[in-house]
Amino acid sequence: HSDIVAPYILHYGSEALKHKYLPQLISGERVTAIAMTEPGAGSDLQGVKTTAVLDGDEYVINGSKTFITNGFLADLVIVVAKTDPKAGAKGTSLLLVEADTPGFDQGKRLEKVGMKAQDTSELFFQDVRVPKENLLGQAGMGFAYLMQELPQERLTVAIGALASAEAALQWTLDY
């Protein structure tokens, strides 16, 4: 979680969000996830259907996500949601949701072939209310933020896969 979620809070979070969450991420007190993928939309970040509607001082989130790494055990989730569904990619925003927020359900743990130590799950949001201060960066900039951070995330995952493959090859040769 420190390679994937922490950079979003570090780069786009307010000073208050950084002070509240980054120490908890570093200490391991909180487990985090980022909720992008949706049933029916896959990883098409412009086609996200989850919405976050501003209601006074809160955003009200509705929608669902699937194949979310760390989703089952996460205490804190970055949710990719449409704050302006008519604006396409420019209507996408990122919001922090704590797992104990009413209306948030972590669903079931999904079965996987590999990486069994890392959970993957569905997430459901039904009238989940979060303070508007939980918005990362500016409303409507979420897609741009994702495009900025995803290359580093993908590189981190690729390096881990390559290191695992090299280790497996070496263990095989040694055997």
Predicted segment positions?
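Internal helix-loop-helix
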Residues: 1-29, 69-76, 87-88
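Residue-level signal for inorganic ion chemistry
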Residues: 14, 63, 95, 125, ...
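Short beta-alpha junctions and helix-cap segments that line functional grooves
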Residues: 21, 48, 64-66, 107-111
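A short, Trp-centered hydrophobic/proline-enriched beta-strand micro-motif
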Residues: 28-36
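Short Gly/Pro-enriched turn/cap motifs at secondary-structure boundaries
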Residues: 40-43, 67-70, 84-86, 112-119
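A short core secondary-structure module
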Residues: 62-106
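Glycine-rich beta->alpha junctions and the first turn(s) of the following alpha-helix
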Residues: 104-175
